[in-house]
Amino acid sequence: MKLLLLAALLTAGVTAHSISTRAVWQFRNMIKCTIPGSDPLREYNNYGCYCGLGGSGTPVDDLDRCCQTHDHCYNQAKKLESCKFLIDNPYTNTYSYKCSGNVITCSDKNNDCESFICNCDRQAAICFSKVPYNKEYKDLDTKKHC
């Protein structure tokens, strides 16, 4: 999960900024679908070694492993021909999906890049909902523990 990558994208221009803001907000809403009442940007950003900008070392728990898997999924998405441009990449692209109850369904109208990214975010949101949140790993000193 590269939620803070938004800051890095600000230098890419106004268009990338507005799109990346929507992409981050969209992932946030997907997490809220699987975990109603959560505050994803506050709770999951800077958690463990992988939740937030960057990621290295050994995940500290199952939630951190969800973030590591999400990072790897985005790395795979970037290898797709349809996900290589600034506007069409995992950190800036948006997609269509539905939330019904706690079930997320990615739209079959998404293009290849959008579909891949939607499923990366969907799997991460589902993963987050199935594992415990350990407060001691929030704002972890990654230089020391990762």
UniProtKB/Swiss-Prot annotation:
* One GO-annotated biological process of the protein: positive regulation of cell population proliferation
Cite a single GO MF annotation.
calcium-dependent phospholipase A2 activity
Quote the EC number: 3.1.1.4
Catalytic residues at H70, D121
Q: Where is the signal peptide?
A: 1-15
Compartmental location: Secreted
Q: How is it modified after translation?
A: Activated by trypsin cleavage in the duodenum. Can also be activated by thrombin or autocatalytically.
Q: Which cofactor does it need?
A: Ca(2+)
* CDD domains (UniProt xref): PLA2c
Q: What's a Pfam family in this record?
A: Phospholip_A2_1
Question: InterPro entries given for it?
Answer: PLipase_A2, PLipase_A2_Asp_AS, PLipase_A2_dom, PLipase_A2_dom_sf, PLipase_A2_His_AS
What GO cellular-component annotations does this UniProt entry give? Answer: cell surface; extracellular region; extracellular space; secretory granule
Q: List the disulfide bonds.
A: C33-C99, C49-C146, C51-C67, C66-C127, C73-C120, C83-C113, C106-C118
Which keywords annotate this record?
Autocatalytic cleavage, Calcium, Disulfide bond, Hydrolase, Lipid metabolism, Metal-binding, Phospholipid metabolism, Secreted, Signal, Zymogen
- Name the catalysed reactions: a 1,2-diacyl-sn-glycero-3-phosphocholine + H2O = a 1-acyl-sn-glycero-3-phosphocholine + a fatty acid + H(+); 1,2-ditetradecanoyl-sn-glycero-3-phosphocholine + H2O = 1-tetradecanoyl-sn-glycero-3-phosphocholine + tetradecanoate + H(+); 1,2-dihexadecanoyl-sn-glycero-3-phosphocholine + H2O = 1-hexadecanoyl-sn-glycero-3-phosphocholine + hexadecanoate + H(+); 1-hexadecanoyl-2-(9Z-octadecenoyl)-sn-glycero-3-phosphocholine + H2O = 1-hexadecanoyl-sn-glycero-3-phosphocholine + (9Z)-octadecenoate + H(+)
Q: Where does Ca(2+) bind?
A: Y50, G52, G54, D71
Propeptide residues, chain positions: 16-22
Entry note: cofactor: Binds 1 Ca(2+) ion per subunit.
Its biological purpose: Secretory calcium-dependent phospholipase A2 that primarily targets dietary phospholipids in the intestinal tract. Hydrolyzes the ester bond of the fatty acyl group attached at sn-2 position of phospholipids (phospholipase A2 activity) with preference for phosphatidylethanolamines and phosphatidylglycerols over phosphatidylcholines. May play a role in the biosynthesis of N-acyl ethanolamines that regulate energy metabolism and inflammation in the intestinal tract.
Q: How does it assemble?
A: Monomer or homodimer.
As for family, the record states:
Belongs to the phospholipase A2 family.
Output this protein's name.
Phospholipase A2
Q: Gene behind this chain?
A: Pla2g1b
